[in-house]
Amino acid sequence: LLSTVTATGNAGFLGTVRVSGNTSLEGQLQLTESAAAAVHTTAINGVTSVSLNFGIAQNFLTTVTAAHTLARPTNARVGQVGSIFLVQSGGSGAISYNGCFKFPGGTAPTFATSNGAVSRIDYIVASISSDNTGENIHAIMTQEYA
């Protein structure tokens, strides 16, 4: 099918269904039995200033080997949620944050320094600027996952 498709009522699909382009859903999407939804994870290793592209993924992973700065993400959408996984390598890595990241109490968290420590920043985009970069991103970090 290479054009607009509208399904009214109940629709079922067996096998693999790939949708590209804009997709709109009205009503409910229900996953049953052994179904699962997975979100693409993007590696961002080896970059000191990281501007995540929120248009290609919601979840991100990086190994922190030096001083990294989380810059303003591009292609953000209001209401978008996700996680940024940070893995400490050697204990010398550090994270700083662009001012668009808003943490509880107004204080950015300190990144765990134990070798192999995993920290997770969960976020929701509260507002964006006119160029679709994140303007206010509410974030919280949990640390020291083993």
Predicted regions and their residues:
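Serine/threonine-rich low-complexity intrinsically disordered regions
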Residues: L1, G9, T110-A112, S129
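Register-specific beta-strand positions within repetitive beta-rich fiber domains
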Residues: L1-E33
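Exposed extracellular interaction/assembly regions and N-terminal maturation sites
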Residues: T23-F103, G116-V118, I124-A146
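Beta-strand-rich interaction surfaces with strong enrichment in secreted/lumenal proteins
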Residues: A71-R72, A108-A112
